[in-house]
Curated annotation (Swiss-Prot):
This is Uncharacterized protein Rv2248. One of its GO terms (cellular component) is plasma membrane. It comes from Mycobacterium tuberculosis (strain ATCC 25618 / H37Rv). SUPFAM superfamilies: Restriction endonuclease-like. It comes from the Bacteria.
Length: 271
């Protein structure tokens, strides 16, 4: 097939151009894009940064570009491909191909992000169970002296694999930065009839809980009704629920922390 015929196929939707000179019948997933990249470069690409994080299941940043280690050969500049030199990076096989090791990847991604997203990455890495805290600590030591490593090292003691979303991680960092008592994460509350509900953040002794409310979670009236019913039952058990939304976390963190602090103070006084 000539280049002109290929261009016509792409224009008509019969083919998808994955990389220069490499086509697919349909839009490939991440592994498909990496396999096509192998064809494009004539070798095996080694994934790193967000691409490696996605392979391990802890990419909190929805990485679109493909990030790979420098293969040591000249490559044609290509949109959507980022090539990196990473001396000393540990490698591991995942989904049938090489990538930077999970702990190394988590630290490398974290040290390039703002603190809230860095904590989200460390939380997600622990939650994925692809690496242990001790392995992340070792990776921090291995990357000492590199840009952003001090912030990553300072955040690591607060990383917690129980966090279920990146925004929960961001909200928790607000609490940490404002000196609030650390909450229990995904805390189970049991009802009188044997029911069990989990709350994102809990201070059990104070019977205070906080819940991050995402737009996606309340996509319709059924979801909203479910949550309102749940909250009512928790309140019947004597719990106070503090709702948290994205603007609380990113635009008014001080007010959010003060609101939680007031509820904690009231609970102490009542107790």
């Amino acid at each position: 097939m000539t280049r002109q015929q290929l261009d016509v196929q792409v224009k008509n939707g019969g083919l998808v151009r994955v990389w220069y000179g490499v086509y697919a019948a349909q839009e490939p997933d991440l592994l498909g894009r990496l396999a096509a990249l192998d064809v494009f470069m004539g070798g095996h690409a080694v994934a790193c940064l967000g691409t490696a994080a996605a392979l391990y299941g802890f990419d909190t940043e929805n990485t679109v570009a493909i990030h790979m280690l420098d293969p040591g050969v000249r490559m044609r500049p290509t949109v959507g491909l980022m090539v990196h030199q990473r001396v000393g990076a540990r490698l591991q096989r995942v989904s049938g191909r090489l990538a930077t090791a999970p702990a190394w990847t988590a630290v490398e991604v974290a040290r390039q992000l703002r603190r809230p997203r860095a904590l989200a990455t460390l939380d997600a890495a622990l939650r994925s169970m692809r690496c242990a805290r001790s392995e992340i600590e070792n990776a921090v030591a291995e990357q000492r002296g590199r840009r952003g490593i001090v912030a990553a090292r300072e955040l690591l003691p607060f990383a917690d694999g129980r966090a279920e979303s990146a925004m929960e991680s961001e909200a928790r960092l607000v609490m940490i930065d404002h000196g609030l008592p650390l909450p229990e994460l995904q805390y189970p509350i049991h009802g009188h009839g044997g029911e069990m509900w989990r709350v994102d953040f809990a201070w059990p002794d104070m019977r205070l809980a906080a819940e991050y409310e995402s737009i996606e979670w309340h996509a319709g009236p059924a979801e909203m009704l479910r949550d309102k019913t749940r909250w009512a039952k928790l309140q019947e058990l004597g719990w106070t629920i503090v709702p948290i939304v994205v603007d609380d976390v990113r635009r008014e963190p001080g007010r959010l922390a003060a609101r939680i602090a007031r509820h904690l103070d009231r609970a102490r006084m009542a107790g």
